[in-house]
């Protein structure tokens, strides 16, 4: 049996299901490229049959990613598998992942079927997927609540049909680690052809046991772990990949397995996922939380100063979290900024140096010194907002006080035209938003507003993340500035640009559909 554990990332499929606003194709690609740098073996990036947007995302990522295998999800339905294959065919290497429920409860109440019918359907669909690729994964949905004898029958049949990976999900996060290990061991004992496939696990955190269950399964013989960065996902989330990866690295003495992950990319990938998905990382989150390597106890601090290994089982550097430096000021040139980005591991293709340097100079004039986390924040925001903008914040001014009604005046560039409006509001941010809404006449409803500090002290950058509802769809916007009202305004303008771009995409899709329809009529 191989000692390498395959890392299967589902941040962009199962993880995205938990988000309040869907990610754009560009945002998904940004995360996919980060996962590729981190070295994930397989990335599941969508459910193509679910929507044209998901199909486009899968196809775009499949075209761009070269060093990881790209995977798409499909139910045991002919159309699902055919559409998944169509979206993936541009990839260097791809996998089709198909699934069907196997537990008595799901078979009886959801599928209204029988186990024999489920097995027959699984065989047919695995064979159909094999017509497109020799890499087919089959999942037994709700395997954690499936009797072992039934599960063994399904697994044996799927392998005989051509499945090369068999996934055993704890779909509702119900099993205990010793139970889950028993399921994996039981399959090895009962399935005669199990050596012809890789056994995978997909766990959920409803009882806080997703990572524990995955590691127990690895110890019992599983050689693929599925999960999401930062553990994002439906309900209580998925298995946190960064936790499993580092547990395998730190406790190699017991597990005796390894991964092909570039550990130096873990922290940066985690931060990127957090920012793009608008899901802050708790300070006490294992591996990537801001307190993961902090020591406040005097006894602990003394021990760490004498020898870090007294209280640290891994180092910040082992996940790519290096010490903050204070070496850039308004007198630093473009070469210095580029050199620092190089040192932090960023490639030039990941940011626009001209835009970054302009933003850096403006910030350096305000703050004096610019930190690494400032540069990363500027690069991230620049990447998010580098697409052509229809709306641009030209000017704003607010007046408010403890006994005054907040008033805002806003100038907004709308295409080639600059428009101005003033409005009152419940505080300066609300006043700015009311003025922006008057200018655009978009009936935007604010669903979520969050503010986080990027840096330390009074000169920290304020990052505002908002989720807004427009015509039944949710859009995410982000803004960054030393002034909170300014970053709030920028976040709303980002939302408006996302709404405008979505409308333009919809117009283009309608135009293409009409063009195709006209061609059919001509023929």
Swiss-Prot record:
Binding site for Mn(2+): 14, 202, 204, 238
The entry's keywords: Amino-acid biosynthesis, Branched-chain amino acid biosynthesis, Cytoplasm, Leucine biosynthesis, Manganese, Metal-binding, Transferase
Pathway in which this enzyme or protein is active: Amino-acid biosynthesis; L-leucine biosynthesis; L-leucine from 3-methyl-2-oxobutanoate: step 1/4
GO molecular function, one term: 2-isopropylmalate synthase activity
Reactions listed under catalytic activity: 3-methyl-2-oxobutanoate + acetyl-CoA + H2O = (2S)-2-isopropylmalate + CoA + H(+)
PROSITE patterns noted in UniProt: AIPM_HOMOCIT_SYNTH_1, AIPM_HOMOCIT_SYNTH_2, PYR_CT
Residue ranges annotated for the Pyruvate carboxyltransferase domain, each copy included: 5-267
Span list, region Regulatory domain: 392-523
Cofactor: Mn(2+)
Its EC number(s): 2.3.3.13
SMART domains: LeuA_dimer (SM00917)
Record carries keyword Transport: no
Alphabetical list of Pfam families matching this protein: HCS_D2, HMGL-like, LeuA_dimer
Protein location: Cytoplasm
UniProt GO cellular component terms: cytosol
CDD domains noted in UniProt: DRE_TIM_IPMS
Gene3D superfamilies: 1.10.238.260, 3.30.160.270, Aldolase class I
GO biological process annotation, one example: L-leucine biosynthetic process
The keyword Cytoplasm belongs to this UniProt entry's keyword annotation: yes
Principal location class: cytoplasm
Subunit relationships: Homodimer.
NCBIfam families (UniProt xref): leuA_bact, PRK00915.1-1, PRK00915.1-3
Task performed by this protein: Catalyzes the condensation of the acetyl group of acetyl-CoA with 3-methyl-2-oxobutanoate (2-ketoisovalerate) to form 3-carboxy-3-hydroxy-4-methylpentanoate (2-isopropylmalate).
Family per record: Belongs to the alpha-IPM synthase/homocitrate synthase family. LeuA type 1 subfamily.
Name of the protein: 2-isopropylmalate synthase
Organism of derivation: Escherichia coli (strain K12)
Gene behind the chain: leuA
